[in-house]
Regions:
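Intrinsic-disorder-associated, low-complexity terminal segments enriched in Asp/Asn/His/Tyr and depleted
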Residues: 4-5
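Residues that scaffold, gate, or flank divalent-cation-dependent active/transport sites
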Residues: 10-139, 145-147, 151-161, 166-169
Length: 169
């Protein structure tokens, strides 16, 4: 389920129920949408849903692989992990040089938001842009459904990470 595309949220929400030995556990999976490209858009004060941007190293030539493309590029039919020469010549776009340190900083800041809601032992980081949270013991504490809790976290990420960077000059 995509959440709040109209305000530029960059998160895919997945709520997973997992039954273990007759005990139901509820996990949230937050997968940051086209993370590298979205970070590059935010850093440039651009909306990832309305910006044509690819993350690639052009010094490697037209055969360079795009590490990420913005959601807008995907809507135009451009495939993630394509090569530069595979992007239709009619599509105008911004090329962002990969900045792994910057992506790690954003990921760490987002992890800090997760820690506002969950103990670290209930957060299972899968990759730089995806984490699973065992929400089982927190739903009652926060008096929320899994979807409500996930949406609350997403709003926090949007306001703390995205909005603060977007309006920072």
């Amino acid at each position: 389920m995509f959440t709040n595309n109209k305000n530029g949220a960059i998160i895919i929400l997945k709520v997973i129920d997992w039954r273990v030995k007759n005990m139901q556990r509820t996990y949230l999976c937050i997968d940051l949408k086209t993370f590298y490209a979205s970070v590059e858009c935010v850093e440039r004060h651009l909306d990832p849903f309305n910006t044509n941007l690819v993350v690639a190293d052009l010094s490697r030539g037209k055969g360079a692989i795009c590490l990420a493309i913005s959601p807008k590029m995907k809507m135009l039919g451009v495939k993630n992990r394509c090569r530069i020469y595979e992007i239709p010549p009619t599509v105008k776009y911004i090329v962002a040089l990969p900045r792994m340190k910057k992506y790690i900083e954003y990921s760490a800041n987002i992890y800090a938001i997760y820690l506002k809601y969950f103990a670290k032992e209930d957060i299972h980081v899968y990759s730089i842009d995806e984490a699973f949270m065992d929400a089982t013991n927190y739903l009652k504490m926060y008096n929320m459904t899994a979807v409500e809790l996930a949406q609350t976290i997403i709003k926090d990420i949007f306001h703390i990470i995205i909005v603060s960077n977007y309006f920072e000059y």
